[in-house]
Amino acid sequence: MRLNLSGHLSDHITFCYTGGQRLERDRPTALFIHGAGHDHSVWMLQTRYFAHHGWNVIAPDLPGHGRSSGPALKSIEDLAHWIITLAHKLGTERPVVIGHSMGALIALQVAATAPELVSQLALVGVVAPMPVAPALLDATLSNRDKAHALINQWSFAPHSQIGASGVPGINLTALNERLMERQAPGVLHTDMAACNAYRAGFDAAAQVRCPTLLLSSAQDRMTPPKALAPLATAFNTDFQPTRVVLPDAGHAMMSESPGQVLDALWAFISSQPTGQAPA
């Protein structure tokens, strides 16, 4: 699905993946937000499952990413306002908002800025603040190949880096490298700089007014579970998040452990009174 968010920060064509299904007003909606240097395809298994089990799915390519035109937006706050505009444009009512990495920061800021919009929140592979190593941030400007290699080194568990994959015949690190290569020059740096500069995470968490899942992975070296504690404690006492840690994946958990990620999201959403899990 393509649409134009006319008059907003990005007056360009936006591509949204819907899992191969039409949006229906009588269905609950899940809005998936990808991370830095990626596009909607990182959510392929999860979005298709939701779309074929009674849910509307909206998985946009952020501005300047994938099939969406325009420049990449430079701050998490601008990206959050863009997501809010997209949700209103599509007429979605209180979607579940799910984000990974940079997308999780965006989702968090969306829930803080427009708490009336979000029914449930799932933050996958997140910490706040989310500092980016200077060597990686420099490489995103000066040497894209090096940046991609560093990201693969830090994003995947050791067994994935030597060829293990839940999908036979798929090289996960090569697939991730090709995905990053498809983004326009400068997009990865803009994304990483936005993550590095975002300092509003604790304030945002305190403003969240919906059930929240913090989904981590034990072998994640970019957003390790132990670094999540400060953000987890920043949530309002009436809205303490549910924490789940997957045992066998790294930061790229949607591709390393796609079924486990889906199971964790589905179980959390189904357990909440606002979730409309199908029979």
Spans of model-derived segments:
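Active-site loop/oxyanion-hole signature of alpha/beta-hydrolase fold enzymes
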Residues: R2, L9-G20, M44-H52, N56-M102, ...
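Active-site glycine-rich loops that stabilize anionic/oxyanionic intermediates
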Residues: G35-H38, S101
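Flexible "cap/lid" loop of the alpha/beta hydrolase fold
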Residues: L105-L150
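Conserved alpha/beta-hydrolase catalytic His-Asp/Glu region
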Residues: D138-R209
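Short beta-strand/loop motif that positions the catalytic acidic residue
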Residues: V208, L214-S216, D220
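Short alpha-helix in the alpha/beta-hydrolase fold that links the catalytic acid
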Residues: C210, P224-T233
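Catalytic histidine neighborhood in serine/cysteine hydrolases
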Residues: T233-H251
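Catalytic histidine-centered segment of alpha/beta-hydrolase-like enzymes
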Residues: A249-L262
